[in-house]
Amino acid sequence: MSRTIVLLLFSVITSLSASAKNLPMKLWYDTPGEYFEESMPIGNGRLGALVYGGTQDNMIQFNDITFWTGKPVNRNDDEGAHKWIPEIRKALFNEDYKLADSLQLHVQGNNSQFYQPLATLHILDDNTNEATGYYRELDIDSALCKDTYIKGGVRYTREYFASHPDKVIAMRIRADRKGAINCLLSLTSLVPHKVRSSQTSASGDNNRASLTINGHATGDPMNSIHFSGILTTQTDGGKILASDSTILINGATEAVIYFVNATSFNGFDKHPVTEGAPYIEQAADNSWHLVNYSYDQLRERHIADYKAIYDRFQLTLGNANFDTKRTTAQQLKDYTDNKGGNSYLETLYAQYGRYLLISCSRTPGVPANLQGLWTPHLWSPWRGNYTVNINLEENYWPAEVANMPEMAMPLDNFIAALAANGKFTAKNYYGITQGWCSSHNSDLWAMTNPVG
């Protein structure tokens, strides 16, 4: 009897696990995204993109997790700040809070720097017909983003992914009618920049053109991180015309677009200009590397790399159903309105969190910030910094318990940088010569001083 019960339980558990495993982990919608919160984030741990999926203007915003304002902290700032602490204590003991408040300004340093957006790609469609049958999804199981729609009787399908092994944001546009892809590509940025175009062929199946965008973070260019991004386009059929800062595609059946980037960030204690990384050469190397692979090969390499981490963890909850009738947005609304629960959403929520951390935390010394790695804003909320009193820790709660411990390595490296700068903060601001400290805000440069 007991053996029968065990076998039955094993059968039920196996069935539940197989059922949960077969449920696709997808966010899906039937309209394009209009603003940041409705975009679909993809990332390779350093380079990321926000995909909005517009049918007339498909906007894609690029980010690099190492692209911040500023330069390394001056460790000798406010060397005598700790001398004000006895006066502050005295004012507090005397209940002279106004005086204490004014004195504490002497033990505040500069605020953290800003995490900034990199560049924005606009793909303007020449087909002005109304789009119908729109669908877009973010497939968490394979880290692929896709949208599809019909315009003028033509079915268009677009796919996007961010590859860690090949350091690229990749996109493919397909039409089910020959020569139906006609669009204009433009690359711009909110930070100081210049764009130039180049063309390697005038026509044919191997048409190829590129846009190169070079710029720097907001501020003095001699004290700022610089970047170089290269966008390349190759078509199947049709013609490509590169002009000024745009690429015009006419009469293609398929178009593949790649974006690579490099910055001059070379470490928290290295000046981004005088000691910066050779970002122009690195971007060029990243771009040339792609000629070794077809789009499908890059896609396969990306999926294999991602799933080697993602597939380690499975969450099985009862009564989970993948809803093909209600969009993810509608399901969430119904869930919060208590119109019937679906444990699928809870499973999706957990796996989406894992997806985001895998997508934004694979750069040594640079952990996920308040934005993860995705921001459309020139001045990110709360500077997009590292709020170490809770938010930074929250980002990494799932790293080990959800079986992806290597995602925490950038955080470990960052803590070592905080310790290096923090011993000067402990000495200068608190008169402590043994040990180190960090205040509640930090940035790419491992700032540790207190601020107001």
Question: What positions do the PLM features span?
Answer:
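Bacterial Sec-dependent N-terminal signal peptides
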Residues: 1-22
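Aromatic-residue-lined binding/catalytic grooves and analogous aromatic/hydrophobic interfacial grooves
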Residues: 21-452
